[in-house]
Every structure is written in structure tokens, then in C-alpha cells.
Amino acid sequence: GILSSFKGVAKGVAKDLAGKLLETLKCKITGC
């Protein structure tokens, strides 16, 4: 239903944000 598809979208967005955050952190630590 709508709820499960919303959960899927939220999971995708969270994964995307986490990936960007990790990359930014890596850049700050190791220097891009």
C-alpha cells in the first residue's frame, strides 16, 4: 500500500543522505 511505498522511498532517501554524509566526512579526514 501507500505506507510501504513511502517506507521504501524514505529508505532510499536515507541511504542517499548517509552516502553523501560519508563522502563529505571522508573528504574532510583524508582530503579529497
From Swiss-Prot:
Protein name: Ranatuerin-2CSa
InterPro entries per the UniProt record, alphabetical: Antimicrobial_frog_2
Record comment regarding domains: The structure is characterized by a full length helix-turn-helix conformation between residues Ile-2-Leu-21, Leu-22-Leu-25 and Lys-26-Thr-30, respectively.
GO cellular component: extracellular region; membrane; other organism cell membrane
Protein purpose: Antibacterial peptide with amphipathic alpha-helical structure. Active against E.coli ATCC 25726 (MIC=4-5 uM) and S.aureus ATCC 25923 (MIC=8-10 uM). Has a weak hemolytic activity on human erythrocytes (LC(50)=150-160 uM).
Family: Belongs to the frog skin active peptide (FSAP) family. Ranatuerin subfamily.
S-S bridge residues: 27-32
Organism: Rana cascadae
Tissue: Expressed by the skin glands.
Keywords annotated in UniProt: Amphibian defense peptide, Antibiotic, Antimicrobial, Disulfide bond, Immunity, Innate immunity, Membrane, Secreted, Target cell membrane, Target membrane
Subcellular location: Secreted; Target cell membrane
Domain of life: Eukaryota
Stored Pfam families: Antimicrobial_2
Signal sequence, renumbered to the chain: none
GO biological process: defense response to bacterium; innate immune response
